[in-house]
UniProtKB/Swiss-Prot annotation:
UniProt keyword annotation of Glycoprotein present: no
Any Gene Ontology biological process: aminoglycoside antibiotic catabolic process
InterPro entries per UniProt: Acetyltransf_17, Acetyltransferase_Eis, Acyl_CoA_acyltransferase, Eis_dom, GNAT_dom, NAcTrfase_Eis, SCP2_sterol-bd_dom_sf
HAMAP family reported in the protein's UniProt record: Eis
Keyword Methyltransferase carried by entry: no
EC code(s) of this entry: 2.3.1.-
Active site feature: 128, 418
The protein, known as: Uncharacterized N-acetyltransferase SAV_4024
Molecular function in Gene Ontology: aminoglycoside N-acetyltransferase activity
Assembly behavior: Homohexamer; trimer of dimers.
Family, per entry: Belongs to the acetyltransferase Eis family.
Keywords: Acyltransferase, Transferase
Residues noted as binding acetyl-CoA in the record, renumbered to the chain: 87-89, 95-100
Provenance organism: Streptomyces avermitilis (strain ATCC 31267 / DSM 46492 / JCM 5070 / NBRC 14893 / NCIMB 12804 / NRRL 8165 / MA-4680)
Length: 418
């Protein structure tokens, strides 16, 4: 067995891309076979300096990459984020500190670049807290039992003057980016999408590892003709024993910038002949969906889990980037064992905005940088975290003050997997 010091952790060279992909596929328990097309495709978007590998005697045994991203803070401001993905360690080389070394390199570079936060979607819950990440958003999936919804089976379109049309991938690529950006600017926790995202999700770029099946696309336009919603969905063509159609519509993604558009698209999906169930895909935990139905119990929660994990790299810029509903002052003692964002900070919130600055004043709360990330987007409760022993009140009532300042009326949501 090689010693950890004998394993080289570094950015990959172009000639090592195929070996890196093989290690990536192996780590995710996929076939290690690598095609020339996959090498060409991944080479088109990998950022060389931010694509790391761990090499043991020239063979790649761990993978890690990051890329630039914009994350929406509470209030709609965007902050630059270091988005992390494709993290694997081959089973033969686990527990040797390879992920720790790759993470340390990447976060140090992100801090130096001026990124405010790092983000990732965690495949396993226990891994990333030790690197200062906290679960900042959650997602919920519902399955709708269409016959139970109470919707009028004669529904034939929105009654608000808007309309729904089926469109093709080209139409989605034209209307989708601007629509999504409008949503992202108002949705804390949402992240930016590049052109490639739209190409992959409309079949322009086809991946060896994910065989492409053309989905259906439907667009909602308001009475004025403005695009306010889009949905991508598939149907499974299932028939029951008595020659009865029992199809399930699986939503790949649905974005809407108004409640009217969201309601109309869900009603449309539930109105399609032969559809008896609708799987919603990953939605915000406080999504309006169940309440768009006359019988909300027809939408049954099938999965609920943590989703976007955030690691704060710059406490001052992160806390000053977001908005707050109230006024007040809070002193936070932020513990960061990796030395990237720790310190004592005084947050002052008033009608003119927020000011955060280092301070020597007594702290009201002591918390790990990962817990601060969970609080930053407004989802977590400092009072609950204190009850769990994950936040320490140094001054009585400080957790309640933190909740009054940091919690939001709507929950953050990240619609994307990356």
């Amino acid at each position: 067995m090689s010693r950890p010091d004998d394993i080289d952790v570094r950015p990959i060279a172009e000639a090592e891309t195929a070996d890196w992909i093989r290690a990536l596929n192996t780590g995710f328990l996929r076939s290690p076979e690598v095609s020339e097309r996959e090498v060409a495709d991944r080479s088109s978007y990998l950022v060389p300096a931010r694509t790391l590998g761990a090499f043991d005697n020239g063979r790649c045994v761990a993978t890690f990459r990051s890329f630039p991203q914009e994350l929406t803070a509470v209030g709609g401001a965007s902050v630059p984020a270091d988005a992390i993905s494709n993290v694997t360690v081959t089973a033969t080389h686990r527990r040797r500190g390879l992920l720790t070394r790759m993470m340390a390199q990447d976060l140090a570079a992100a801090k130096e670049r001026g990124d405010v936060v790092a983000t990732l979607i965690a495949a396993e819950y226990p891994i990333y807290g030790r690197y200062g990440f906290g679960a900042a958003t959650h997602s919920t999936e519902w399955t709708i039992d269409v016959p139970r919804t109470g919707l009028d089976p004669r529904w034939s379109g929105p009654g608000d003057g808007g309309r729904i049309d089926l469109v093709d991938g080209e139409d989605v690529r034209k209307a989708g980016p601007e629509l999504h950006e409008r949503l992202r600017r108002t949705q804390p926790g949402a992240v930016s999408r590049d052109e490639r995202w739209w190409q992959v999700h409309t079949g322009v770029v086809r991946l060896d590892r994910s065989p492409w099946t053309e989905p259906f696309y439907a667009v909602y336009r308001s009475a004025s003709g403005e695009v306010e919603g889009l949905v991508s969905y598939e149907c499974d063509d299932h028939w029951g024993d008595a020659k009865q159609p029992q199809n399930t519509a699986k939503v790949n993604w649905l974005i809407a910038t108004t409640p009217a558009a969201e309601r109309a698209l869900w009603h449309y999906l539930c109105s399609i002949d032969w559809i008896t169930k609708v799987r919603t895909g990953w939605r915000a935990p406080d999504d309006l969906l169940p309440h768009f139905l006359p019988d909300p119990r027809a939408a049954r929660v099938t999965t609920h889990a943590d989703w976007l994990w955030v690691r704060i790299l710059d406490v001052v810029r992160a806390l000053e980037a977001r908005t707050y509903d109230g006024s007040g002052t809070l002193v936070l003692d932020v513990v960061d064992r990796h030395g990237l964002a720790g310190g004592r900070y005084r947050l002052t919130v008033g009608p003119d905005g927020a000011v955060c600055e280092p301070t020597t004043r007594d702290a009201g709360l002591t918390l790990d940088v990962g817990e601060l990330a969970a609080l930053w987007l407004g989802d977590a409760s400092a009072v609950r975290l204190a009850a769990l022993g994950r936040v320490r009140e140094q001054q009585e009532g400080a957790a309640s003050v933190a909740d009054a300042l940091l919690r939001t009326s709507g929950r953050p949501w990240c619609p994307d997997m990356f």
